[in-house]
Amino acid sequence: MRHELSPLLRLLASGEDLIYAPASPEGIPARLLNAEGDDLPSGCDLPAELSVVLWGLDDHIVRELRECPLFDSTTLLFPPITPSYLRLSHRRASYDLLAYLTDQLGYPSDLLPRWIEAGVDRSATELRLRAAIEGIKSRPLGDPTRVLIKRPYSSSGRGVFPLPLPLQEKHLEALVGSCTRSGSVSIEPYLEVVDNWALEYTRSESGEVSFFALSHFDTLPSGRAYLGNILTSPEDLWERLTSLMSEEALLTLINAQCTWLEKELSDSQYTGYIGIDLFFYRDGECLRLHPCVEINLRTTMGVLAHFAYEQYVPDGRKGIFRLERGPRQQPSQSIIPLLLTSSEAHFSAYIELEK
């Protein structure tokens, strides 16, 4: 996946930036691309030092880059992975922000998940999980026939799965195993999601967190995995979101999230993008906002979609940014491919313009 999708990073690149395309599972070696997404000429000399800007900080990726022969004669300068970065990369951080928003802005406390740490043995873990599931089930909010389970470090819909109720022994056994392996799991109400959004921020070297853009995206119902982003002007996105909540409430939420992020990252050297996922859910006859589903301390698909709109969507047009399994879509009046891949490709990325 990373090998095929790496040329998409040209949406973020400019000037003399280089893009690292990792080796493919089929054995195609790693290579470097220029800011336009084209292969660098063979034998091209690299600078003595390169500052590395990662999609997201990850020990595995850092190790891969350090060991890559492409950089044998180049010193790579990596951003530090600090305790505060690791803390905010854990899904527990979204609980902490949600608790803050519940306290400061009055969002319902029934939205708060239950974080269950693995016990000293399987029996202790099972008791904790049973009690937490019963506690979530007793809340007036959510689907009474299931709860939602999340693993601590997964994102973009991965590691998220519904647990059917009443609880069956085989499902409980699998959940105990998952909690034991990952160290903890989150259990929360299963809500009827109507509309998915994200607030995208940037953090500067001075530590200031600023609003960057809105992201309006679709997910697959099964597992709630990412499906695509709505591409339209920032003004239109703002108008769409403030048709679902008041502008005052949105500005208050943005200010509160910025305040919390600046405080939590005060000892961090992280600079770059931060995405906070939201969604609107149905509660009886009402549509309500979940103000913090997930924190993504990295570049997000929403940021990529923002630049795809700026660079590829004609003035006055709207569309959808798609990332899918399978070969690329053929160009047409309504399809703009973003990857020039073969018919054997495993993934495709394209813009589908409104007709």
Describe the role of every protein-language-model region.
Residues 2-8, 20-140, 154-155:
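Conserved N-proximal alpha/beta basic substrate-recognition cap immediately N-terminal to
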Residues 115, 146-172, 198, 221-241:
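Glycine-rich phosphate-binding loop of ATP-grasp-fold ATP-dependent ligases
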Residues 168, 304-317:
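A short alpha/beta connector and helix-capping loop motif
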Residues 182, 211-214, 223-288, 324-327, ...:
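A long amphipathic alpha-helix within ATP-dependent nucleotide-binding catalytic cores
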Residues 220-222, 292-306:
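Glycine-rich phosphate/pyrophosphate-binding beta-alpha loops
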Residues 314-355:
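Peripheral (often C-terminal) accessory segments that flank ATP-dependent C-N-forming ligase machineries
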